[in-house]
Amino acid sequence: LTKYFSEDIVEGILQDEHANSLSGRHQEATIMFFDVRKSTTIAENLEPQVFAEFLSEFFTDIMDLVYGNHGSVNKLLGDGIMSTFGCPVPTANDVLNAAKCALQIRNHLATFNDVRPDYIKEPIRVGMGIATGKVFAGNIGSVRRMEYTVLGDPVNLASRLESMTKEAGVDILIDGNTRHRLGNLIKCRKVQHQGVRGKLQEIEIFSLDELLKT
């Protein structure tokens, strides 16, 4: 369980406080997608074992930040991570925790690039997308393989926001729902009302600049 959830959530599950939360339900959650840009180029310039070790160590640091902000790692996506805040147990701070996590990843990346190994020739760049809303979360599968899965519009939107960061020239994009729930806790800039693939209507998109207060 500690591979997926933060220690406080695991403790609740083991004490049977949140065990039913894993069986499946509709709930509010904040989703964050994280992706390492140009990872294919990095991989092509390194021996496979070296690249695997680099990515594993780098992801360990990122996942520690997710867990440290009461998030959960839902999926490893090759060169990316899907994490959730509020699954399986929603709290009043899920949106704020996701924003804190993204900003801490930004700061960690700046430090990493200053001391990165010689074999990483160019600074590592990443993109992050955050969206908030109703999702389905629960165990799906069979006796052979079971997986805790999170599905819903916020998952798709967070993924698309992450993919839009490069074009927007920023590292973190959030949807309007996330932005409005954070209120005056953050400094952000509206990118624009923009069409997103799979969405019939344009949505508000913001870049996340900094945390003002908590």
Spans of features found by a protein language model:
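Regulatory cytosolic signal-relay segments
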Residues: 1-27
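Catalytic strand-loop-helix junctions within cyclic-nucleotide turnover domains
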Residues: 84-94, 128-148, 165-169
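Acidic/histidine metal-binding catalytic segments
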Residues: 77-78, 118-129, 171-178
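A generic structural signal for short hydrophobic patches within well-formed alpha-helices
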Residues: 10, 39, 82, 178-179
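A structural signal for short, well-ordered beta-strand segments
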Residues: 31, 81, 126-132, 205
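Alpha-helical scaffold within the catalytic cores of cyclic-nucleotide enzymes
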Residues: 55-71, 87-128, 153-166
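Cytosolic regulatory/linker segments at or just downstream of nucleotide-handling modules
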Residues: 135-137, 158, 164-214
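Catalytic NTP-binding/metal-coordinating core of nucleotidyl cyclase/transferase enzymes
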Residues: 19-100, 148
